[in-house]
Amino acid sequence: MDPTLISLGALALAGAAATVSGCAEDLESDVGSQSNPNSQVQLGPQMGNIHRYFNKAISGEPVSYGLYVAVAGSVAWALINAGLNAVLALIIGSGVAAIVHGAYSVSAFLGRTVGQSQKFGQPVYMDVLTSHIGPIVGHGFIAVFTMVLAAYLAVTALGNPFPLPLVALIFGITVGAIGSSTGDVHYGAEREYQKYAFGGGIPVANQGDIDIYAEYGIRNGLDSSYFCSRLGGPLTGLCFGLIIFLDGWRSIVGNIIGGDLVTKTSIALVVGLLVVVAAMILNRKIEVFARNKYGPYRN
């Protein structure tokens, strides 16, 4: 079969895996309230808002997912070199990473909550721990497995020269950064502050004054993930999937058109710059359209 067709097929599969990974990563961070929005959850009890959110900001998402995916990639790489089937090795590696993820989540939740219990009266809700840890580990496993799968395809089928653990680390940092910058806005700026008028941002005076009541009963992280699965999660997945696909696509275009290595690299760089410029123009047009359509926030 034509090597170009094999590369295109592997790239399409890697892009699809990255899309699923980005969506699952964002929803996992919504269940556990990690990264940027967690600062508001941490401030909640200090503002008198006793809540039932799962408070587990172990670190920023880029660092934590860099760790999880690197653990999965390292275990899978060792097992593959030992002669184990690649798919089974990726599953086992992702399972080990899920255990690490769960251990960090439990310790972070208990440590951060206990630190606020005496002075600010925030209880440690054990039912929140037991009900949230499953979705956290489950979403995390999906995100890590699809991410390490994309890294494996990059190494074996797309010609990436670096070893699997290093590529997995880079991909994990990338998906964490995208989830933190793209999907968390939907959770932190909207879901946590639905009692305030939409579009007003989060003034300093309102920080920590988060919503503690849901549509029915007391709000928790599971409610947040359900809400964000309609917009924040899919947008995170789409963003990361497009990055993986377009980055690989520019390299394939360079290999098809170019002759020697320098020409291939130059064409790939030019195509990449054109994609970035097109994305900037499209982003600007969407922003101007939205401002003209809905107008400035006046209150």
Curated annotation (Swiss-Prot):
Keyword Transmembrane helix: yes
Catalysed reaction, written as an equation: 5-methyl-5,6,7,8-tetrahydromethanopterin + coenzyme M + 2 Na(+)(in) = 5,6,7,8-tetrahydromethanopterin + methyl-coenzyme M + 2 Na(+)(out)
Membrane topology type: Multi-pass membrane protein
GO biological process: methanogenesis, from carbon dioxide; methylation; one-carbon metabolic process
Leader sequence residues: none
Compartment(s) of residence: Cell membrane
Swiss-Prot/TrEMBL keywords: Cell membrane, Membrane, Methanogenesis, Methyltransferase, One-carbon metabolism, Transferase, Translocase, Transmembrane, Transmembrane helix
UniProt keyword annotation of Cell inner membrane present: no
EC numbers, comma separated: 7.2.1.4
Pathway: One-carbon metabolism; methanogenesis from CO(2); methyl-coenzyme M from 5,10-methylene-5,6,7,8-tetrahydromethanopterin: step 2/2
A Gene Ontology cellular-component term: vesicle membrane
Transmembrane spans: 57-77, 80-100, 133-153, 158-178, 237-257, 261-281
Disulfide bond sites: none
Source taxon at top rank: Archaea
GO molecular function: tetrahydromethanopterin S-methyltransferase activity
EC class of the enzyme, as a word: translocase
UniProt cross-references to NCBIfam families, sorted A to Z: mtrE
Function: Part of a complex that catalyzes the formation of methyl-coenzyme M and tetrahydromethanopterin from coenzyme M and methyl-tetrahydromethanopterin. This is an energy-conserving, sodium-ion translocating step.
Family listed: Belongs to the MtrE family.
HAMAP family tied to this protein: MtrE
Subunit structure as annotated in this protein's UniProt entry: The complex is composed of 8 subunits; MtrA, MtrB, MtrC, MtrD, MtrE, MtrF, MtrG and MtrH.
Protein name: Tetrahydromethanopterin S-methyltransferase subunit E
Lineage, broadest ranks: Archaea, Methanobacteriati, Methanobacteriota, Methanomada group, Methanococci
Gene designation per UniProt: mtrE
